[in-house]
From Swiss-Prot:
Protein family (similarity comment): Belongs to the universal ribosomal protein uS19 family.
GO cellular component: cytoplasm; small ribosomal subunit
Role noted for this protein: Protein S19 forms a complex with S13 that binds strongly to the 16S ribosomal RNA.
Keywords per UniProt: Ribonucleoprotein, Ribosomal protein, RNA-binding, rRNA-binding
GO molecular function, one term: structural constituent of ribosome
Any one GO BP annotation for this protein: ribosomal small subunit assembly
Organism, as annotated: Psychrobacter arcticus (strain DSM 17307 / VKM B-2377 / 273-4)
NCBIfam families: rpsS_bact
Domain of life: Bacteria
Pfam families noted in UniProt: Ribosomal_S19
The protein's name: Small ribosomal subunit protein uS19
Amino acid sequence: MPRSLKKGPFIDAHLFAKVETALETNSRKPIKTWSRRSMILPQMVGLTLSVHNGRTHVPVIVSEQMVGHKLGEFAPTRTYRGHGIDKKAKR
């Protein structure tokens, strides 16, 4: 269920402050964040955010199509190593 329009998008205050300073200083350095729950705003387009996936920080370059989505959607937390081998079919 989407968030109510009258509430507006959620973004952590510390992340928003880092984004604002990066825009003011025109910095190209990645912004490291643990806030996977924050929504991507139009001001973030073009920035590089390092989103934590539980083990490492995954670099995410924000584009126009990502606006309105959450940061966690672009940093997968699970690694898929394939299904197990069927030993009966191998014979």
